[in-house]
Amino acid sequence: MADFVSTSPFGPVLTAMVTPFNADGGVDYGVAEKLADHLITHGSDGLVVCGTTGESPTLSWEEEHELFRVVKQTVGDRGSVIAGTGSNCTREAMEATQIAAKLGVDGSLQVVPYYNKPPQEGLLAHFQAIANCAPELPLMLYNIPGRTGQSLAPETVYRLAEVENIVAIKEATGSLEQASLIRAHTPDDFAIYAGDDVLTLPLLAVGGAGVVSVASHLVGDRLQAMVQHFAQGATAQALEIHLQLIPLFKILFCATNPIPVKTALGLQGWPVGSFRPPLCALSPGHTEQLRDVLRDLALLP
C-alpha cells in the first residue's frame, strides 16, 4: 500500500481493470491474473473489476463472479479488489453484492441505476438496500450520468454517506463543483474519487482521496508519484506529472472507453484480445494517434 494517507480503505490509485478475452471471445482468466499482478506491482493500490472499463454490460454474472475470485486470489493482501456488482435492478444488485462479499473482495462498486432513471428517493432506497444486505462490505457509489441518464444529486450523497458501509463515491460527472459540495457536507472519512484521469489532481486539491483510473494501466507508477507528491506538499512536481500525462488522458477517450486503453495494451504486447459487440475496434486514424502518444511517453516496447 502506498505512503499516501487516504481517507479510503481502498487506497488512492485504483485501476478500472479491462477484461481480457481470448480468440474465441471468452474471458481469458489467465491473462486477467497476469494483468492484475502487473497493475498491483506498478503503482495501483487496488483494482476495480467488472466496471465500465471491464465491459460489464456484456459479461455474464458467472463470468463476473469468476473474475472476482481469480483477481482477488492473485492480488491477495497486496491491494484492494472492488467488485462491480451494480445493476438497475435492486434485487440483482443485492444478490451480486452478497456473492462478491462471500468471494472475499474488499469492496463493491455500485453504479447509479441506468435506463430506468429512478428519482432521488428511489436512488436513496436502492443504495440503502444494497448496503444493508452486505453490511460488512464497504461500498463505493458510482455517479456517471453520461452513461446512466441519471445523476446522483449531492443532497442524496450526503444522506447515503451516513450509512456506515457506504464509504466512497466515484464522481464521474466532471464537475468539481459537485465534488466540492460533497466534500463540504460529508464526513472526513467519506472518500471522493475522480472518475476521470484528467481531474485527479484538481480533485485532490478540493479534498478528493484519489482516482479510479484508466490511464493507470499504462502509467500507474507515474500516477502514484503524482498523488504522493501532492500529499507531501510538492505541488509543483505533482503538476509537472499531470501536465506531462494530459495527452495520454485525452487520447484514451478519443473513442468509447475501454476501446482506446485496450488497444494501447495490445500495442504494448498484452494479449487482452478485442471487444464484445457492440463495442468495436479503434479506427486506424485514432490507433496511429494513440501510438504516437505512447511513443512520446516511452510506453512502447
UniProtKB/Swiss-Prot annotation:
Cellular component terms (Gene Ontology): cytosol
A GO term, aspect molecular function: 4-hydroxy-tetrahydrodipicolinate synthase activity
GO biological process, one term: lysine biosynthetic process via diaminopimelate
Residues reported to bind pyruvate: 53, 212
Site (Part of a proton relay during catalysis): 52, 115
Homology family: Belongs to the DapA family.
Name of the protein in question: 4-hydroxy-tetrahydrodipicolinate synthase
Lineage: Bacteria, Bacillati, Cyanobacteriota, Cyanophyceae, Synechococcales
